[in-house]
Amino acid sequence: AAVALARQAYRLSPAEAALLLALLGGQTPQDFADARGVRIRTVRAQMSALLFKTRTQRQQDLVALVARLMLVAPQNDFRD
């Protein structure tokens, strides 16, 4: 629910939302690139877009922002 809320609030693309979910799950950008079969350059571009859209500057800030959203999102499932 938190990722779905972030996706709607910040107009994230499906790829950006998937990256966000992976980061929340503890994956690194390289892990995500390997799992998706894409280049790290692609993931870095998606990360840059995520940071820009959420007005955060670092991956840690992004994860903290979504963690705060988890406090207000419905508690049924954070894996949307």
Annotated model-derived regions:
Residues S48-D80:
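Basic, Lys/Arg-enriched C-terminal extension of HTH/homeodomain DNA-binding domains
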Residues R11, F32, A67:
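Residue-level marker of positions within ordered structural domains that often coincide
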Residues G26-D61:
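Recognition helix of helix-turn-helix DNA-binding domains
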Residues A15-L19:
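The N-cap/first-turn positions of alpha helices
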Residues Q8, L21, L51:
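Generic anion/oxyanion-binding catalytic loop in active/binding sites
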Residues L5-R7, G37-R39, R79:
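Short, charged/polar low-complexity linear motifs in solvent-exposed/disordered segments
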Residues A1-P14:
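Regulatory hinge/linker segments at domain boundaries
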Residues L23-Q27, V66:
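Short helix-to-turn junction characteristic of helix-turn-helix DNA-binding domains
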